[in-house]
Design a protein with these regions (language model features):
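Metal-dependent amide/peptide-bond hydrolase catalytic core
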Residues: 13-18, 232-410
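Histidine/acidic-residue-rich, glycine-tolerant segments that coordinate divalent metal ions
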Residues: 100-102, 107-118, 124-125, 140-270, ...
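Short, Lys/Arg-enriched N-terminal segments with co-localized hydrophobic residues
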Residues: 1-12
Length: 410
């Protein structure tokens, strides 16, 4: 998950995280808490990166092998898990599996055993939540419980490296199981413990990588007139972009540069400078406006300073845009949960958006109430919040989308 920590604080700054953070969450699925706590802590110890989630996948499959389900390999280390309730259509639930290249600084007894790698984005919790849900589905099958849909669970690698979701979309898994809709969730530190949040329409930003390269001419620092200063051109570019920032705010967008590389020695005009940054937007028009602004500024700098400027943009994720029709159908059922509707979208990006390009989908946040940001080396949470995640998935599976009814008591 790609995000801007300050933006997350701004969006949720009016929430008093201390008010519910000390509660212990209990619901009708509390009998699963020992299992999901063990799963989460075991998985937290063995974080792996990208598609290289071999230990993680083996652990999850070992748990699932004891349940009445079909495990099907997908791309690379990803896999699908099918619970057959004899229905024509299926509902899909997705979780991510990979960790981050972060050295853990918690003192938890279940801290990462893999040096330089940590589950700092809660994917261990997402998997534990899904395994708890799988236990519930297995129970329903043993009880021969009638449900409106089959359940397809997707365990996705490489969310952090942006490859996983797109690779799965390019398979035929959704057609093979006649999937009607897809749901997912993400642990969220900036809302109350156990609270579930979502919204119709745009929820999370489109993420675009931006790289700007400046090519000038080297010269001695004592004779700057003989060179063309790429570093000066880069500074001019950033200054002009930041002068344009009021437009970004009006358009609900961000353009932020966080990395600069230039020169090799202190006493020479730099012939080469590069800037790396990120852009967050919610629609194509705003995206095009910002890209055009960067290219216009680049043209001005080329003419005024004589440095060649190349602006390269490459998309990471499209925006997470929850299907408004699907959201309207499930919203009634969500009233039985600790649910709140987000006021506005967030600038964080998530590759769940790739699934929403091909299926109606809704994404949710599940509050940890800690206030510790994602991608932080102290990230942690209480596993009891996952009980509400299981309840959410159970409610969604039982919601009959054609009639908008749900068997809440079952």
């Amino acid at each position: 998950m790609v995000y801007n920590g300050h933006e997350m604080e701004v969006i949720f700054m009016d929430i008093n995280l201390s008010s519910k953070n000390e509660i212990i969450i209990k619901n009708e699925f509390s009998y699963l808490i020992d299992d999901i706590r063990r799963y989460r802590q075991d998985l937290h110890r063995i974080p792996e990166l990208g598609f290289l989630v071999y230990k993680t996948g083996a652990y999850v499959k070992e748990v699932l092998s004891k349940l009445d389900c079909k495990i099907e390999p997908l791309v690379n280390t990803g896999f699908a898990v099918f619970f057959d309730f004899g229905c024509e259509e299926s509902i899909c639930f997705r979780c991510d599996m990979d960790g981050l290249p972060i050295e853990e600084q918690t003192v938890a007894f279940y801290a990462s055993e893999h040096e330089g790698c940590m589950h700092a984005c809660g994917h261990d919790g997402h998997m534990a939540n899904m395994l708890g849900f799988a236990h519930l589905l297995d129970k329903y099958i043993r009880e021969k419980k009638a449900l409106p849909y089959n359940a397809l669970l997707i365990f996705q690698p490489a969310e952090e490296t942006i490859d996983g979701a797109e690779a799965i979309v390019n398979t035929t898994v959704f057609e093979d199981y006649n999937v009607k809709a897809i749901y997912g969730l993400h642990l969220w530190p900036m809302i109350e413990k156990g609270e579930i949040a979502s919204k119709p329409g745009p929820m999370m930003a489109r993420s675009t990588n931006v790289k700007v390269v400046f090519e000038g001419k080297s010269a001695h620092a004592g004779e700057p007139e003989k060179g063309r200063d790429a570093l000066l051109a880069a500074c001019e570019f950033v200054t002009k972009i930041y002068d344009y920032k009021d437009n970004f705010i009006r358009e609900r967008s961000i353009l932020q540069f966080g990395k600069m590389e230039s020169g090799n020695v202190r006493n020479a005009i730099s012939p080469y400078t590069s800037l790396d940054g990120t852009m967050r937007t919610f629609n194509d028009l705003t995206w095009a406006k910002i890209v055009n602004a960067m290219r216009n500024i680049a043209d001005d700098i080329e003419q005024n300073i004589g440095v060649k400027v190349d602006v390269d943009v490459s998309q990471w994720h499209p925006a997470v845009v929850n299907d408004t029709s699907l959201y309207a159908k499930i919203k009634y059922a969500l009233k039985n949960l600790d649910f709140v509707e987000l006021r506005r979208p967030v600038m964080i990006a998530e590759d769940f958006s790739c699934f929403e390009q091909v299926l109606p989908g809704v994404f949710f946040f599940l509050g940890t109430g800690t206030g510790i940001p994602l991608h932080n080396d102290h990230f942690d949470f209480d596993e009891d919040v996952l009980l509400n995640g299981i309840k959410l998935f159970d409610t969604l599976l039982k919601t009959q989308l054609s009639t908008c009814s749900v068997d809440i008591g079952s």
